[in-house]
Amino acid sequence: MEISWGRALWRNFLGQSPDWYKLALIIFLIVNPLIFLISPFVAGWLLVAEFIFTLAMALKCYPLLPGGLLAIEAVFIGMTSAEHVREEVAANLEVLLLLMFMVAGIYFMKQLLLFIFTRLLLSIRSKMLLSLSFCVAAAFLSAFLDALTVVAVVISVAVGFYGIYHRVASSRTEDTDLQDDSHIDKHYNVVLEQFRGFLRSLMMHAGVGTALGGVMTMVGEPQNLIIAKAAGWHFGDFFLRMSPVTVPVLICGLLTCLLVEKLRWFGYGETLPEKVREVLQQFDDQSRHQRTRQDKIRLIVQAIIGVWLVTALALHLAEVGLIGLSVIILATSLTGVTDEHAIGKAFTESLPFTALLTVFFSVVAVIIDQQLFSPIIQFVLQASEHAQLSLFYIFNGLLSSISDNVFVGTIYINEAKAAMESGAITLKQYELLAVAINTGTNLPSVATPNGQAAFLFLLTSALAPLIRLSYGRMVWMALPYTLVLTLVGLLCVEFTLAPVTEWFMQMGWIATL
């Protein structure tokens, strides 16, 4: 018997999301206009809380849908205007271009990145050294590329290697369901569990590496570009401004990587089983023998394009998104990717997040129009200039660990800029606050997958169930990094940021605009 019209509509609404989640969103949509009539300020904060809730529940439903419905309603009832949303989007066009073109551009360099991580995995036998190499490689790549893409590449390597060994362990040559362990021989099971532990630790080291590298440059994370634009900094300026905090944090983060592997804490320390290494080495040798001259040329071309990318970013030869577009054109032209559908696949990863970011800007417009953050900013600005830095860092960190850091970074840098333009703080203090906001947004956010887009991407990937990486386990494995990165970042903001920045100015390396 066919279901009723009402039941059909209910099932279609937000698809596979749980019924309680659908009901919660409907309640939000009914309550918001009523509260807005009574108190626009309270309604504005309620909208922000609801939006953060949709981000926290990203595994139940992609936040673009519920967040978009809330944003559309906010414009309809007058919490902000469509014109203001357009202005916010226009002001952040560079960020949208970064997400659209840079992420897609790096997609066409995946073969080179896969080659690099495969060589690392099979060439280095020491687990401590291998973990450090993955962390450093991910950090370096994330300083110039998009963190999501770097994690996507490492996931591709891990899924590929897991699949190779899983087929051997289940004594099957054809493609099988990787989640089906029913055909695994008993003596392979222990080895497979050890291999899962090994891959889990590598993935977490790589994920944290993207955060360590991503905070250092203006293209490492989308919010960095927003902050750099608000402060008027180019690539080199941004790197130097952040370095009093980011360099000590990077060093301590890498030491943490070695420590947890050495002491086998928090689920780290599992080594690559020798049986697995033999299987993977055989497969790699076979692949190398089958690699044609055309394949080798592709790798060389991608490496040259990588050099162009780093050079163009460092010298600020064009807007970041346009440099990404040049990478797409060069990579596709010189590696023979000419089919429209093949090119289109490169954009599937970035466009949903680009659309979500546009919804962020709608909520930012509400925050500005309803002056929601004014009380918090006033509280922070009443403190001494020295204390302001730590307070901004802490407030950013708390919110970033449960919400998306692009959203948080955008809000706080807008408020700080408004305070500077109104004369509440000096330009010099504003530039120091921009560093505190950027580091506070990026570093503590490794605490949960909600804060780091790369972590959320890993958690929702096909790899996570294969290696038994759950939300709780990810939070537990990230804990040592969360503590070290957050505390070292706070100490650097408190004690090294102002004096080192002053010294840079005296040396003539940076200047206040």
Curated annotation (Swiss-Prot):
According to its UniProt entry, this protein's organism is: Shigella flexneri
Places the protein is found: Cell inner membrane
Transmembrane regions: 23-43, 52-72, 97-117, 120-140, 144-164, 202-222, 238-258, 303-323, 348-368, 391-411, 447-467, 475-495
Q: One matching Pfam family, short form? A: NhaB
**Function noted in UniProt:** Na(+)/H(+) antiporter that extrudes sodium in exchange for external protons.
Q: How does it sit in the membrane?
A: Multi-pass membrane protein
Record bears the keyword Cell inner membrane: yes
Would you identify the family this protein belongs to, as annotated?
A: Belongs to the NhaB Na(+)/H(+) (TC 2.A.34) antiporter family.
Protein known as: Na(+)/H(+) antiporter NhaB
This protein's GO CC annotations: plasma membrane
